[in-house]
Curated annotation (Swiss-Prot):
The keyword Cytoplasm applies. It catalyses: 4-imidazolone-5-propanoate = trans-urocanate + H2O. It is found in: Cytoplasm. It comes from Shewanella putrefaciens (strain CN-32 / ATCC BAA-453). GO terms for molecular function: urocanate hydratase activity. Its main location: cytoplasm. Coiled coil: none annotated. It is an enzyme of class 4 (lyase). The keyword NAD applies. GO terms for cellular component: cytoplasm. One of its GO terms (biological process) is L-histidine catabolic process to glutamate and formate. This is Urocanate hydratase. The active site is at C410. NAD(+) binds at residues 52-53, 130, 176-178, 196, 201, 242-243, 263-267, 273-274, 322, 492.
Length: 555
């Protein structure tokens, strides 16, 4: 019997102000853990899988139940320790310490590979936490929509003089992360053709308004794109097909998209990528009998897809890696020039990271969308001179369906995160908001990740693989008084290729919360400015000086 599979489970986080725990500081992690497994949020909630292949919220259902039980009895001077999705200890700390500390998927470097991890996983000794799955701050696909939107806007500026009308993006994957591409692309003015092998994912994206249309053949999909572009109105199409097949076929036909990328779960060749010519049922059966054959076939198909991406780049497409490690997989299969197209961070995002700008997100624990709309207005009030941000908030309200507890994300930096959070805390205190909010972020942020094939690719000083930085980030956030802090390995790009940390803090309207919020949401983005200043980026050095950061070696 698989202790991780229970189709009878239907998890919905409580709404409103009635507590199941002893305070909001423990109610918040409980609700957010439950929200990660909401049927409109998680990809396979019956298996505890939130997103990203096998990114889970808890190791198994026994562990999930015990975590909930412990959070409901936890005192405000105690801390729960969670080891790869398993609650392993409760210790007396103090009121400003985190209520939960989480470590997921971490392995000693020599053994930090999928083969060893999968053995531990089968033995029930480990859990893949991805980034926000095991750290209980996943908010559905909205979580990366704005970052993807910012990237596509940058692509238009760099390659098409800012004009995206009549242009289209080819991509793969409509899972928890990839599903953002279609909506973000159309928001940025592009049409999008996204290949997906799992029809239920396409249907889910249709239901949540992330995809406009579904196609079952390439000809049908291309006709939809062509019609939309002729009409001057972007459209997103989910094509039921294998990305490797489609990308290669477009090369064969001489059809060149304007932009090419991919967000399949290529980081996990065993569980995340369907080999060419295989059905999903065949792959599921083979995973139980011959893992090596699945991995080999998946990586061979990735090599086909990456070669097609390179060919489309040569034909004139703006081609970028979107952080799923597909280039590495293809390189290992003999595609020697797999890294000839850039990752999205060095190509488009790094200047933002240099100012501590990244994916700031918050969730209304009340369950009331009005709380989010009120905070949207507060963001506009406090940041009046950022039209791109205002445009994002307007589009998000109009086009993004909430999944589970209402949430919002917007990319803001060092100078704004703490003051926004303090304003939210004041709104809780004075009753403008009906219940507390939690504030967190993706682990994909300026100071919280080491990932040489993604966030820290091509660092100016060559420090791509130095992972001291996310460790320092987690330690500082713990010392600063975050409500829960997490330290993970392997998110985004898979085992052996990344280390990263997460942070969440509760705004419950108290003066004590205001002090914690002020520390955490200044220090957290400040570590990103510090990290990039240390690597030699002038934007970061100037930001550090302007914001008065004390960086001894920058004097």
């Amino acid at each position: 019997m698989d202790k991780r599979h229970d189709p009878s489970r239907r998890i919905i986080a409580p709404h409103g102000t009635q507590l199941s725990c002893k305070s909001w500081l423990t109610e918040a992690p409980m609700r957010m853990l439950m929200n990660n497994l909401h049927p409109d949020v998680a990809e396979r909630p019956e298996d505890l899988v939130v997103y990203g292949g096998i990114g889970r919220a808890a190791r198994d259902w026994d562990c999930y139940d015990k975590i909930i039980e412990v959070l409901q009895r936890l005192e405000d001077d105690e801390t729960l320790l969670v080891q790869s999705g398993k609650p392993v200890g409760v210790f007396r700390t103090h009121a400003d310490a985190p209520r939960v500390l989480i470590a997921n998927s971490n392995l000693v470097p020599h053994w930090a590979n999928w083969e060893h991890f999968n053995e531990l996983d089968k033995l029930g000794l480990a859990m893949y936490g991805q980034m926000t799955a095991g750290s209980w701050i996943y908010i559905g696909t909205q979580g990366i929509v704005q970052g993807t939107y910012e990237t596509f806007v940058s692509v238009a500026k760099q390659h098409f003089e800012g004009i995206s009308k009549g242009k289209w993006i080819l991509t793969g994957g409509l899972g928890g992360m990839g599903g953002a591409q279609t909506l973000a692309g159309t928001m940025a003015g592009f049409s999008v053709l996204a290949c997906e092998v799992d029809e239920t994912r396409i249907d889910f994206r249709l239901r949540t308004r992330y995809v406009d249309k579904k196609a079952t053949s390439l000809d049908e999909a291309l006709a939809m794109i062509e019609a939309a572009n002729q009409a001057g109105k972007p459209v997103s199409v989910g094509l039921l097909a294998n990305a490797a097949d489609v990308f290669a076929e477009l090369v064969k036909r001489g059809v060149t998209p304007d932009v090419v990328t991919d967000q399949t779960s290529a980081h996990d060749p065993l569980n995340g990528y369907l080999p060419q010519g295989w059905t999903m049922a065949e792959a599921a059966a083979m995973r139980k009998t011959d893992e090596a054959a699945v991995i080999k076939a998946a990586k061979a198909s990735m090599a086909v897809q990456v070669q097609a991406m390179l060919d489309l780049q040569t034909a004139g497409a703006a081609t970028l890696d979107y952080g799923n490690n597909i280039r590495q997989m293809a390189f290992e299969m003999g595609v020697e020039n797999a890294f000839d197209f850039p990752g999205f961070v060095p190509a488009y995002i790094r200047p933002l990271f240099c100012e501590g700008i990244g994916p700031f997100r918050w969730v209304a624990l009340s369950g009331d969308p009005e709380d989010i709309y009120k905070t949207d207005a507060k963001v506009k009030e406090l940041i009046p001179d950022n039209p791109l941000l205002h445009n994002w908030l307007d589009m998000a309200r109009e086009r993004i369906a909430f999944q589970g507890l209402p949430a919002r994300i917007c990319w803001v930096g060092l100078k704004d995160r703490a003051r926004l959070a303090l304003a939210f805390n004041e709104m809780v205190k004075n009753g403008e908001l009906s219940a507390p909010v939690v504030i967190g972020r993706d682990h994909l942020d300026s100071g919280s990740v080491a990932s040489p094939n993604r966030e820290t690719e091509s660092m100016l000083d060559g420090s791509d693989a130095v992972s001291d930085w996310p460790l320092l980030n987690a330690l500082l956030n713990t010392a600063s008084g975050a409500t829960w802090v997490s330290l993970h390995h392997g998110g985004g790009v898979g085992m052996g290729f990344s280390q990263h940390s997460g942070v969440v803090i509760v705004c419950d309207g108290t003066d004590a919360a205001a002090k914690r919020v002020g520390r955490v949401l200044w220090n957290d983005p400040a570590t990103g400015v510090m990290r990039h200043a240390d690597a030699g980026y002038e934007i970061a050095k100037n930001c550090a000086k302007e914001q008065g950061l004390d960086l001894p070696m920058q004097d």
